[in-house]
Amino acid sequence: RYWLPDDWQANVGAALDELARVTRLGGTLVVIETLGTGTDRAGPPSEPLAEYYAWLERARGFARQTIRTDYLFASVEEAARVTGFFFGPELATRVREQAWTRIPEFTGVWSRRR
């Protein structure tokens, strides 16, 4: 894991605890994360993120909603250029091969009431 390899749960947990502390009783805590770009189904794009998402749900009591947040571009070339910049050349190649002007994207919204 490239982010907080040994103590990510303690660090993320501390951030979530602070979020809960500053949220009014009855308020909603919200975490927004990716569930995939350039894919036809929602899911964690890596094993470390799968572990993190499961931890949010099981250990921290968050409920997940999945929403489509596709990117829409005027041309295939614009789509390839922009997605290549943000997501790397592999996705840019897929965009060109599939002639996509609409890039599929899934976003997870985890929430929990305080």
Specify the residue positions occupied by each region the protein language model found:
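Short acidic/glycine-rich loop or secondary-structure boundary segments that cap or lie
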Residues: 3-5, 38-41, 73
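Structural element of the ATP-grasp superfamily
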Residues: 19, 53-57, 112
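Conserved Class I S-adenosyl-L-methionine
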Residues: 58, 63-114
